[in-house]
């Protein structure tokens, strides 16, 4: 008996963030791929236009730094995740802490995480 796409989606929906992260890592290892998005090189004029139009930003944690506890607390405060999930997120760097947020919210979160000792990018 084969599993349908709907059954797979239901299984994903029932998983915690930590379980999804572990599943993605296992899939990357098994299939020899990376879940990182491919970067497409475009013309400089196109990049400038796209940057001007961007209204939603992603806050990416690239490293948790030396003060891991403070970074985990900052992640919990920003995302509402539990301790276990926030710890897993900090250890899975690079990882998106928040996606699709305004520039102001992204800058505020970046400042909070950097003050906690993390290395952060906004994309």
Swiss-Prot record:
InterPro entries xref list: Ribosomal_bL12, Ribosomal_bL12_C, Ribosomal_bL12_C/ClpS-like, Ribosomal_bL12_oligo, Ribosomal_bL12_oligo_N_sf
Gene Ontology, cellular component aspect: cytosolic large ribosomal subunit
GO molecular function, one term: mRNA binding
Domain of life: Bacteria
Pfam families the record matches: Ribosomal_L12 (PF00542), Ribosomal_L12_N (PF16320)
Gene3D superfamilies associated with the record: 3.30.1390.10, Single helix bin
One GO process term, biological-process aspect: translation
Keywords, ordered alphabetically: Ribonucleoprotein, Ribosomal protein
HAMAP family: Ribosomal_bL12
Free-text function comment from the UniProt entry: Forms part of the ribosomal stalk which helps the ribosome interact with GTP-bound translation factors. Is thus essential for accurate translation.
Oligomer and partners: Homodimer. Part of the ribosomal stalk of the 50S ribosomal subunit. Forms a multimeric L10(L12)X complex, where L10 forms an elongated spine to which 2 to 4 L12 dimers bind in a sequential fashion. Binds GTP-bound translation factors.
NCBIfam families: L12 (TIGR00855)
Entry's family note: Belongs to the bacterial ribosomal protein bL12 family.
Protein known as: Large ribosomal subunit protein bL12
């Amino acid at each position: 008996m084969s599993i349908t796409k709907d059954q797979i989606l239901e299984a994903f929906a029932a998983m915690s963030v930590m379980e999804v992260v572990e599943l993605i890592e296992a899939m990357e290892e098994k299939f020899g791929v990376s879940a990182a998005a491919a970067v497409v090189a475009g013309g400089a004029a196109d990049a400038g236009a796209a940057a001007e139009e961007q209204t939603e930003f992603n806050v990416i944690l690239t490293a948790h730094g030396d003060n891991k506890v403070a970074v985990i607390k900052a992640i919990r405060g920003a995302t509402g995740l539990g301790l276990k999930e926030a710890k897993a997120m900090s250890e899975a760097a690079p990882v998106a802490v928040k996606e699709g947020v305004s520039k102001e919210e992204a800058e505020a979160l970046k400042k909070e995480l950097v003050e906690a000792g993390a290395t952060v990018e906004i994309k």
